[in-house]
């Protein structure tokens, strides 16, 4: 029987040496928001606690400035 091994999750921000997460980088922020508009938890993305806090504030700022939607399009 073949076993399936999950890839180890790692923080991409720590690996890339990011100091501060920018709220204007919409393409990067969209990777951490679901289709319905929710912020993806760190246990799924593997983001460290420090960068998860920065990520959530960056997403909330982008939403406030209408760069990101709060919810999906409700079709």
Curated annotation (Swiss-Prot):
<keyword id="KW-0699">rRNA-binding</keyword>
<keyword id="KW-0694">RNA-binding</keyword>
<dbReference type="GO" id="GO:0022627">
    <property type="term" value="C:cytosolic small ribosomal subunit"/>
</dbReference>
<comment type="function">
    <text>Binds as a heterodimer with protein bS6 to the central domain of the 16S rRNA, where it helps stabilize the platform of the 30S subunit.</text>
</comment>
<dbReference type="GO" id="GO:0070181">
    <property type="term" value="F:small ribosomal subunit rRNA binding"/>
</dbReference>
<keyword id="KW-0687">Ribonucleoprotein</keyword>
<dbReference type="GO" id="GO:0006412">
    <property type="term" value="P:translation"/>
</dbReference>
<dbReference type="InterPro" id="IPR036870">
    <property type="entry name" value="Ribosomal_bS18_sf"/>
</dbReference>
<keyword id="KW-0689">Ribosomal protein</keyword>
<dbReference type="InterPro" id="IPR018275">
    <property type="entry name" value="Ribosomal_bS18_CS"/>
</dbReference>
<protein>
    <recommendedName>
        <fullName>Small ribosomal subunit protein bS18</fullName>
    </recommendedName>
</protein>
<dbReference type="InterPro" id="IPR001648">
    <property type="entry name" value="Ribosomal_bS18"/>
</dbReference>
<comment type="subunit">
    <text>Part of the 30S ribosomal subunit. Forms a tight heterodimer with protein bS6.</text>
</comment>
<dbReference type="GO" id="GO:0003735">
    <property type="term" value="F:structural constituent of ribosome"/>
</dbReference>
<comment type="similarity">
    <text>Belongs to the bacterial ribosomal protein bS18 family.</text>
</comment>
<dbReference type="Pfam" id="PF01084">
    <property type="entry name" value="Ribosomal_S18"/>
</dbReference>
């Amino acid at each position: 029987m073949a076993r399936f091994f999950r890839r180890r999750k790692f923080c991409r921000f720590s690996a890339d040496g990011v100091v501060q997460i920018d709220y204007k980088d919409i393409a990067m922020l969209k990777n951490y928001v679901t289709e319905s508009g929710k912020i993806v938890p760190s246990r799924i993305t593997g983001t460290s606690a420090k960068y998860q806090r920065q990520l959530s504030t960056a997403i909330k700022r982008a939403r406030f400035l209408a760069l990101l939607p709060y919810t999906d399009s409700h079709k």
